[in-house]
């Protein structure tokens, strides 16, 4: 008897209030790294009706106009009208940054004879994941959820659906049979809109222009449930509808619930923070394991102690899909990937102003040129070391 189950993931658009906060935090991080790549940054953002609060800890030699960066980011997202609840021109922006604690800095900055022995910026555990459900080696539900809100933003920007506004949420439920995606069961899409669009016209346009062009044809079987703006009205949205905070969409940012999460958010954090850099490294490791043909699913856990460079643990789980044992793969990971914090920074070239682009539509599964953690350049080496044939997804 087939093992049949449903699995659901969600995403949110760049105009969702929590994503507005994430993008402001990462825009500030990028501006700082542009001038001083060794800065220590933990930039948190709160946004509400007509108000942005910037707080956190920053130690840098950079001279940054934080208020202007916040306004520019809000403008780029599309909040350029007071009717939307926040307007880049008129919103208040409060700045309250401190410097990084010297107690933390002494552990992070300390170096030994090996200059890669920079300590971790905090304790914690991080996960990376990859699977062969999509060419990008991502779980299908989160991948489709991202593409839906990405298309919503594209049609809003190009004016094809001029009544769209920046805030939107998507949710995709996929039916799995024997562990593989079989069909799409339900799609939910809620989009902010102008007050004069009638609900039937909105629903038809969203289904025909946003949802159907995004779904893979081979997974459209039978009657899919389309739930578009199921409350009936979504005029008030963005930071006016809900207070936005940095770091509140950590499952959207990663694997949509298909893999565990260590709990640490990404946006606004420089790469000395292993919450971010080690999660990126975990994705890099997992993706190369799957691309190498060592397994069709791979979950990586790494953990750290503050001020200590070497991970306190490295774990690999391939859920029974491995062509060699998990113990062998773990050994290969330790041999071929430097998972010390500074080793990760060097391996993935993370001291670059690349982070604002990560802050909407997923940190993983998008093969942008800046996203070094999406490369599969270690796959051939891993396959050769394990004695298996790599998959075709090696780049």
UniProtKB/Swiss-Prot annotation:
Pathway(s) of this molecule: Amino-acid biosynthesis; S-adenosyl-L-methionine biosynthesis; S-adenosyl-L-methionine from L-methionine: step 1/1
InterPro entries registered for this protein in UniProt: ADOMET_SYNTHASE_CS (IPR022631), S-AdoMet_synt_C (IPR022630), S-AdoMet_synt_central (IPR022629), S-AdoMet_synt_N (IPR022628), S-AdoMet_synthetase (IPR002133), S-AdoMet_synthetase_sfam (IPR022636)
Cofactor note: Binds 2 divalent ions per subunit. Binds 1 potassium ion per subunit.
Protein name, per record: S-adenosylmethionine synthase
Binding site for Mg(2+): 18
SUPFAM superfamilies membership: S-adenosylmethionine synthetase (SSF55973)
Keywords annotated in UniProt: ATP-binding, Cytoplasm, Magnesium, Metal-binding, Nucleotide-binding, One-carbon metabolism, Potassium, Transferase
Physiological role: Catalyzes the formation of S-adenosylmethionine (AdoMet) from methionine and ATP. The overall synthetic reaction is composed of two sequential steps, AdoMet formation and the subsequent tripolyphosphate hydrolysis which occurs prior to release of AdoMet from the enzyme.
Named cofactor requirement(s): Mg(2+); K(+)
Pfam families linked: S-AdoMet_synt_C (PF02773), S-AdoMet_synt_M (PF02772), S-AdoMet_synt_N (PF00438)
Disulfide cross-links: none
Residues that bind L-methionine: 57, 100, 242, 273
E.C. number(s) listed in UniProt: 2.5.1.6
GO cellular component, one term: cytoplasm
Reaction catalysed by this enzyme: L-methionine + ATP + H2O = S-adenosyl-L-methionine + phosphate + diphosphate
CDD domains, per database record: S-AdoMet_synt
Binding-site residues for ATP, renumbered to this chain: 16, 167-169, 233-234, 242, 248-249, 265, 269
GO molecular function: ATP binding; magnesium ion binding; methionine adenosyltransferase activity
Region (Flexible loop): 100-110
Family named by the database record: Belongs to the AdoMet synthase family.
Cellular localisation: Cytoplasm
Organism of derivation: Burkholderia ambifaria (strain MC40-6)
This protein's encoding gene: metK
First-level EC class: transferase
């Amino acid at each position: 008897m087939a093992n049949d189950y449903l699995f659901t993931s969600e995403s949110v658009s760049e105009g969702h209030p929590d994503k507005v906060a994430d993008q402001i935090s990462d825009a500030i991080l990028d501006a700082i790294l542009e001038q001083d790549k060794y800065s220590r940054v933990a930039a948190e953002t709160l946004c509400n009706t007509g108000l942005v609060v910037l707080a956190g800890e920053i130690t840098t030699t950079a001279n940054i106009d934080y208020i202007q960066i916040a306004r520019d980011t809000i403008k780029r997202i599309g909040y350029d009208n007071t009717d939307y609840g926040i307007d880049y021109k008129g919103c208040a922006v409060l700045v309250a940054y401190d410097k990084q604690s010297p107690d933390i800095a002494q552990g992070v900055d300390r170096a030994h004879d090996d200059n890669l022995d920079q300590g971790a910026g905090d304790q914690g555990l991080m996960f990376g994941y990859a699977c062969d459900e999509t060419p990008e080696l991502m779980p299908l539900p989160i991948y489709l959820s991202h593409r839906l809100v990405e298309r919503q933003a594209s049609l809003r920007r190009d004016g094809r659906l001029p009544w769209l506004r920046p805030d939107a949420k998507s949710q995709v439920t996929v039916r799995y049979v024997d562990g593989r995606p079989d069909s799409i069961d339900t799609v939910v899409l809620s989009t902010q809109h102008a007050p004069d669009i009638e609900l039937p016209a909105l629903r038809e346009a969203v289904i025909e222009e946003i949802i159907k062009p995004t779904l893979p044809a081979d997974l459209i079987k039978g009657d899919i449930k389309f739930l578009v703006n199921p409350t009936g009205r979504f005029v008030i949205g963005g930071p006016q509808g809900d207070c936005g905070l940095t770091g509140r969409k950590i499952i959207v940012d990663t694997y949509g619930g298909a893999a565990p999460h260590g709990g640490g958010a990404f946006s606004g954090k420089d790469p000395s923070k292993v919450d971010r850099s080690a999660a990126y490294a975990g994705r890099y490791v997992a993706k190369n394991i799957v691309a190498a043909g060592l397994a069709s699913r791979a979950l990586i856990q790494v953990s750290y102690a503050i001020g200590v460079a070497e991970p306190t643990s490295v774990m690999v789980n391939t859920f029974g899909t491995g062509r060699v044992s998990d113990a062998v793969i773990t050994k290969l990971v330790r041999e071929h990937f430097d998972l010390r914090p500074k080793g990760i920074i060097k391996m993935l070239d993370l001291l670059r102003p690349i982070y604002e682009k990560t802050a909407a539509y997923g940190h993983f599964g998008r093969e942008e040129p800046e996203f070094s953690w999406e490369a599969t350049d270690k796959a051939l080496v891993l396959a050769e070391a394990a004695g298996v044939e790599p998959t075709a997804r090696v780049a």
